[in-house]
Curated annotation (Swiss-Prot):
The keyword Cytoplasm applies. Pathway: Lipid metabolism; fatty acid biosynthesis. The gene is fabA. Homodimer. This is 3-hydroxydecanoyl-[acyl-carrier-protein] dehydratase. PANTHER family: 3-HYDROXYACYL-[ACYL-CARRIER-PROTEIN] DEHYDRATASE (PTHR30272), 3-HYDROXYDECANOYL-[ACYL-CARRIER-PROTEIN] DEHYDRATASE (PTHR30272:SF8). GO terms for biological process: unsaturated fatty acid biosynthetic process.
């Protein structure tokens, strides 16, 4: 498939099934773990470091699966799901630029949570800036990311790392 600059939810779910890119390419998780509804922008230029950018959105609805269990009587989106979305988008970037293998989160340098996503929110926006891509024996992307809810920044993560592996047997 030709690289696009934006992707719909149906295309992202096709990625989860291995139908969007080459069969040996990385995949996004399927529902309900896919944590964004669309990628509105993806490029291997631009961003804060000039090495690439990814922008994505998640429509918030009170019936999203995590609100029913986290927490009963005090529904809030788990912070780890927002962080996972940032790793998902970083891995998608690697697949989008042609990296082969299975994506795995490798860590991050720093994470700050300064707000929360409640069922009354409308829109979560993810902004990912690629700071480094290694494409040798080790295939890895490093990014900085922000998560905004209804236009207000609530999560910041620095030095997110995702690698691509041809075998995860001994991972």
């Amino acid at each position: 498939m030709t690289r696009q600059s934006a992707y719909s939810r149906d295309q992202l779910l096709a990625s989860a099934r291995g139908e969007l890119f080459a069969p040996d390419s990385g995949r996004l998780p399927n529902d309900p773990m896919l944590m964004f509804d669309r990628i509105t922008e993806i490029s291997d230029t631009g961003g804060a470091h000039g090495k690439g950018v990814i922008r994505a959105e998640l429509d918030i609805r009170p019936d999203l699966w995590f609100f029913g269990c986290h927490f009963i009587g005090d529904p809030v989106m788990p912070g780890c799901l927002g962080l996972d979305a940032m790793w998902q988008l970083t891995g998608f970037f690697l697949t989008w630029i042609g990296a082969q293998g299975r994506g795995r989160a490798l860590g991050c340098g720093e994470v700050k949570f300064t707000g929360q996503v409640l069922p009354s929110a409308q829109l979560v926006r993810y902004e990912i800036d690629v700071s480094r891509v290694i494409n040798r024996k080790l295939v890895m992307a490093q990014t900085d990311a922000r998560m905004l809810v209804d236009g207000r920044e609530i999560y910041v993560a620095k030095d997110l790392r995702v690698g691509m592996f041809t075998s995860t047997e001994n991972f």
